């Protein structure tokens, strides 16, 4: 029995929710870190103001620190809009897409002994093409990463490389034999019931309007709408 378009959209919505849940620790850290620095800065500023002799220069340094961290917090909060599937957004370049998704998931994958390797050809370049629908592309790439993570046993690394002028190639490689013997690396794997399998990834790609293909341990995706 083939899933209806409505059912496919519900599956895709569930996949997007799961991907956001997996990215939340990194997003939470980006917002919590400035708050910790702000609290410490306010405490130090309070002590300096209460001291018998106020040092204006030291107080100004604390104020500058707090102002800087407020700016970092604002950037982190505003980044939440990147997860909204708006009808149109500012778009994203291929290099920025890979950099953002790798930064979001590097710690989580690293805890499981999975390295994320980015080809030098994906470094930012002047005049690089900006692809529309940045939010959709973030979900697509994170979904591809999650699919390889969930579907390949003893995965040790995912390599990111350009595929032509408008695509990405993700290649999974096995974990080193010594690392594969450490059960601690599998403690944080997603429950099988929440695994992003082939049906889940294809439903996500179809709903977002992009082409994704997998051959063995290699997954390819196109950044242009299908």
What are these regions (language model features)?
Residues 2-3, 9-12, 16-23, 31, ...:
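Histidine phosphotransfer helical core of two-component systems
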Residues 41, 58-117:
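Conserved DHp (HisKA) dimerization/phosphotransfer helix of two-component histidine kinases, i.e.
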Residues 105, 109-112, 145-178:
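An N-terminal amphipathic alpha-helical segment
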Residues 115-128:
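Conserved catalytic submotifs in the C-terminal HATPase_c
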Residues 163-202, 224:
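Glycine-rich/acidic phosphate-handling loop/turn and adjacent ATP-lid/helix
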């Amino acid at each position: 029995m083939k899933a209806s378009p409505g059912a496919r959209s519900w599956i895709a919505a569930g996949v997007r929710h799961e991907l956001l849940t997996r990215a939340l620790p990194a997003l939470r850290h980006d917002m919590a870190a400035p708050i910790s620095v702000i609290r410490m800065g306010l405490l130090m500023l309070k002590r300096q103001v209460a001291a018998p002799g106020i040092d204006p220069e030291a107080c100004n340094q604390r104020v500058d620190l707090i102002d800087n961290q407020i700016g970092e917090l604002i950037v982190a909060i505003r980044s939440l809009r990147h997860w909204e599937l708006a009808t149109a957004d500012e778009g994203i370049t291929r290099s920025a897409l890979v950099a953002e998704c790798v930064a979001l998931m590097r710690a989580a994958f690293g805890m499981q002994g999975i390295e994320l390797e980015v080809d030098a050809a994906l470094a930012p370049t002047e005049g690089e093409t900006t692809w529309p629908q940045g939010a959709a592309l973030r979900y697509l790439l994170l979904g591809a990463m999650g699919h390889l993570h969930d579907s390949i046993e003893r995965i040790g690394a995912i390599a990111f490389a350009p595929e032509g002028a408008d695509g990405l190639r993700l290649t999974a490689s096995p974990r080193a034999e010594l690392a594969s013997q450490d059960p601690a690396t599998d403690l944080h794997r997603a429950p099988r019931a929440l695994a992003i399998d082939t049906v889940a990834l294809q439903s996500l790609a179809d709903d977002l309007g992009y082409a994704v293909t997998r051959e063995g341990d290699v997954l390819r995706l196109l950044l242009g709408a299908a």
